[in-house]
């Protein structure tokens, strides 16, 4: 179902309350990485060009439903005003008369940021009173926060019961690309999964098995699968309670004719730190006790490249190793480059949020994919085929 977007509504002179994702790292009152703020700029600029008055709602971090200075959005207001080249008014409150007054004084083309939505206990409880208050401030709700789409909170879902909710450009792009790879992928379709835990990816493996031709598995989760196949994995990270499940998933894939490709070698070390002694071992020879696999090895990189070479659709979620440390980053980097090269050849390539997005940024490849998702948990749940409350609450386009 197509969702209504900010293009479908008249914004001239209207008050727009926009749920954005300004959940950025802040240190000593300074924004450390403004990627998420920049991602919201096209929607914000469009609303301002159309003559709207814009009020922003966002959370930052996980405060416990009460004000907490280290989670204040004040540094975000400062960074946003630098990026927009205009003053961003800031109210250090979420509800109350101070908020009402600031909204009443807003003029066309002006913007106002309210304090962290999670400073109020009603936000994560989806409290209708809080949602109603925020709705009373505006004519239209614009949801541009895909990162919280899997959560039913007052600022993205509750508010939509009181005023119309439409998608911003970022939300629209997320829905478009994730829908394509989840429901309507062009074949051959290859899924690349990594990261630490099998348990995080069970739903994705199960759902995408119905559609994918191949699933390539790297990252620490590979060791749970390798152990399920009777391989010696030394002191590598294994989810012991998920070994039987890994066996089941491998069996299921066989039944469905989906090829699951596991690593044939690994880069191992005795500690997870820079500059330690490291070796490459073949998986069939086993990883010795006291050593742990921290990246896929060079043979696996070649194998994965070969298995990706004819792909028309690729979804990548989770790094191949401990990419934060350069000694163990090569596998992730090479896989990222291989997928980026497919984008050049016309394939649809989607990178799930979270660590994969961080890896892509680290290697300076963020522009080399069809889409890099801004939501970690939200993109996983979308790929699992679940309906996300933060998308369901956006108005459908009229046929």
From Swiss-Prot:
Tell me if Kinase is a UniProt keyword of this record.
Answer: yes
Output the Gene Ontology terms for molecular function. Answer: ADP binding; ATP binding; phosphoglycerate kinase activity
Mind listing the UniProt keywords for this protein, alphabetically? ATP-binding, Cytoplasm, Glycolysis, Kinase, Nucleotide-binding, Transferase
Where do the annotations place ATP binding? 201, 293, 324, 353-356
The subcellular localization recorded is: Cytoplasm
Q: Which PROSITE patterns match?
A: PGLYCERATE_KINASE (PS00111)
The record's InterPro entries line, in alphabetical order, gives: Phosphoglycerate_kinase (IPR001576), Phosphoglycerate_kinase_CS (IPR015911), Phosphoglycerate_kinase_N (IPR015824), Phosphoglycerate_kinase_sf (IPR036043)
What is the top-level taxon of the source organism? Bacteria
**Primary localization class, coarse:** cytoplasm
Residues that bind substrate: 21-23, 36, 59-62, 118, 151
- GO BP terms, alphabetized: gluconeogenesis; glycolytic process
Q: Which reaction does it catalyse?
A: (2R)-3-phosphoglycerate + ATP = (2R)-3-phospho-glyceroyl phosphate + ADP
EC category name: transferase
Q: Where are the transmembrane segments?
A: none
Q: What is its EC number?
A: 2.7.2.3
Pathway(s) the chain acts in:
Carbohydrate degradation; glycolysis; pyruvate from D-glyceraldehyde 3-phosphate: step 2/5
Q: Name one Pfam family in it.
A: PGK
A single Gene Ontology CC term: cytosol
**Family affiliation:** Belongs to the phosphoglycerate kinase family.
User: What's the subunit arrangement here?
Assistant: Monomer.
UniProt protein name = Phosphoglycerate kinase
């Amino acid at each position: 179902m197509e969702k209504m977007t900010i293009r479908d509504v008249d914004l001239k002179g209207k008050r727009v309350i926009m749920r954005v994702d300004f959940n950025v790292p802040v240190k000593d009152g300074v924004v450390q990485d403004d990627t998420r703020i920049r991602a919201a700029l096209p929607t914000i600029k469009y609303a301002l060009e159309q003559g709207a008055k814009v009020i922003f709602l966002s959370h930052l971090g996980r405060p416990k439903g009460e004000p907490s200075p280290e989670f204040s959005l004040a540094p975000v207001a400062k960074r946003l005003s630098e990026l927009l080249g205009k003053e961003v008014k800031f109210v250090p409150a979420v509800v109350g008369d101070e908020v009402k007054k600031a909204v009443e004084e807003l003029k066309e083309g002006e913007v106002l940021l309210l304090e962290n939505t999670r400073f109020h206990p009603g936000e994560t409880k989806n409290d209708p009173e809080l949602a109603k208050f925020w709705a009373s401030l505006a004519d239209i709700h614009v949801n541009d926060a895909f990162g919280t789409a899997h959560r039913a909170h007052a600022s993205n879902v509750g508010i939509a019961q009181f005023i119309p909710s439409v998608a911003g450009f970022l939300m629209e792009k997320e829905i478009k690309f994730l829908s394509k790879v989840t429901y309507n992928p062009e074949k051959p379709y290859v899924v690349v999964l990594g990261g630490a835990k099998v348990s995080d990816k069970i739903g994705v493996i199960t759902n995408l098995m119905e559609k994918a031709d191949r699933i390539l598995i790297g990252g620490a989760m590979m060791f749970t699968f390798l152990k399920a196949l009777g391989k010696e994995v030394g002191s590598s990270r294994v989810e012991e309670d998920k070994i039987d499940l890994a066996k089941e998933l491998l069996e299921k894939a066989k039944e469905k004719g989906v090829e699951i490709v596991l690593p044939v070698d690994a880069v191992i070390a005795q500690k997870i730190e820079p500059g330690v002694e490291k070796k490459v071992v073949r998986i069939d020879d086993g990883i010795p006790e006291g050593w742990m696999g921290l990246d896929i090895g060079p043979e696996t990189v070649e194998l994965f490249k070969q298995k990706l070479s004819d792909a028309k659709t690729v979804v990548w979620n989770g790094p191949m190793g401990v990419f934060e440390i350069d000694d163990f980053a090569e596998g992730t980097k090479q896989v990222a480059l291989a997928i980026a090269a497919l984008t050049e050849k016309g394939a649809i390539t989607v990178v799930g949020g979270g660590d994969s997005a961080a890896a892509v940024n680290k290697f300076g490849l963020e522009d080399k994919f069809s889409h890099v998702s801004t939501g970690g948990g939200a993109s996983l749940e979308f790929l699992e085929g679940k309906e996300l409350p933060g998308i369901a609450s956006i108005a459908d386009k009229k046929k």
